Amino acid sequence: MALFGALFLALLAGAHAEFPGCKIRVTSKALELVKQEGLRFLEQELETITIPDLRGKEGHFYYNISEVKVTELQLTSSELDFQPQQELMLQITNASLGLRFRRQLLYWFFYDGGYINASAEGVSIRTGLELSRDPAGRMKVSNVSCQASVSRMHAAFGGTFKKVYDFLSTFITSGMRFLLNQQICPVLYHAGTVLLNSLLDTVPVRSSVDELVGIDYSLMKDPVASTSNLDMDFRGAFFPLTERNWSLPNRAVEPQLQEEERMVYVAFSEFFFDSAMESYFRAGALQLLLVGDKVPHDLDMLLRATYFGSIVLLSPAVIDSPLKLELRVLAPPRCTIKPSGTTISVTASVTIALVPPDQPEVQLSSMTMDARLSAKMALRGKALRTQLDLRRFRIYSNHSALESLALIPLQAPLKTMLQIGVMPMLNERTWRGVQIPLPEGINFVHEVVTNHAGFLTIGADLHFAKGLREVIEKNRPADVRASTAPTPSTAAV
């Protein structure tokens, strides 16, 4: 009985679980590109290492090592991998760091000073980034693990006191190696929890698309990593800006991502597009009013000829009044995605009337229009764009079958009017697109769209339009390195 109850609760929870409207998969194919950009960023961060001055005394010799700066990172071997539980793991082995520092030596009344180059060799770094969902639904670096070690140090001392420095070099280089070991992991911890999070802050969560609607890209759960990819589930739901708490129930199928051949895949379900169209419908945007000169001249003449019998019965003051054509969508359009293509079904009312000045309008006809549009999706940069095309069009009377027959001559000119006057306006808006949840400075290239039953996927490669350093510097928060919590680092001496 207890087992039955547990099963029932599990099924009940599953029945109420909301599917994501948008999914993104980053595959291992992207890791080489990400690693190249990440290592450039890492080298720049390691150059910010601040090593305390090293002072000491050996016999009558007093030495001071100061102004230690990391000048370069030379890599022999590095790997970036997905790891379950850890998300991203970077391993650097047998690398070397170039350093430059100021030396000062005092022996009785003799003083020597200057700058010298050194190198830290056999540098190994193993650092992992743990990704999670924060309370606002944003992806964050929630933890950074780190192990770092420097095997040996070498400093090319020279000059009059070369033999003295050679005598002291063991003390100096051992001390520098110890201090350097202690500084690598704190720098990486700050880079992950502060700087990389400032990059992730550029990913839209709840943002405006235009003056009418917004979109919710909040993560529904923590990112899930396997050995070959990283999967993220986003709500992917539009909403009217005047009803920010409104939500369309998601009854669409869950999009599936199986491919791993491209760097990244994005999947959108029918719910993603349905919520967009319903949001615009609720915002009152799906209507069109043409009056007087706004009605195409040929269509004006055809409409007057079609309703000539009704017009001649009106008073002379009304007969030559401006014509009004009003299209109003009656219900939220719906999207259907099949392997053969994507279609959008629309039902609207069409009202034709005369609008004499300073008098009530005179309605000539009211009809219903059924239209089916084909939709082609494309991903450009980081914007999902849509191109619409009118495929099927039918009008019929709300009153009688006889009047529906009389409307047949209007079918072609009304369709032409929609294709020439309405579709360009729609496409101007839909081709502007909506941004997908991607950090600033990263774009998609070489996109391929594939339709499935109930959802579509877009495979693409990644392109860094801006470097990580450029984006992070633009969005860098106030430096909180001093207040950062103690790093979970392990530095091997």
UniProtKB/Swiss-Prot annotation:
The keyword Signal applies. Changing residue 66 to A: Significant reduction in phospholipid transfer activity. No effect on secretion. Keywords: Disulfide bond, Glycoprotein, Lipid transport, Nucleus, Secreted, Signal, Transport. SMART domains: BPI1, BPI2. One of its GO terms (molecular function) is sphingomyelin transfer activity. Its main location: secreted. This is Phospholipid transfer protein. It comes from Homo sapiens.
